[in-house]
Amino acid sequence: SKTLHDRVVNINTMEEEADQLYISSMHTLHTTCTDPIEIISWREIYMYLEKCADACEHVADVVESVVMKNS
């Protein structure tokens, strides 16, 4: 449906924004932080947030695909 497709597009857009935030945050972290433990901690947090965003995008794409195949 059009509404579902619009929502999937919105989720994909948000995931692209999350990618940019991840890159920007990692750059800032590595250029401003001097404590290795803090860098490792934040890097792990950022990595898991990025994986969450990727997983949300994947779920949206799968749901859209299932709906399209069954309509």
Name these PLM-found stretches.
Residues 1-71:
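Cytosolic, long alpha-helical scaffolding segments
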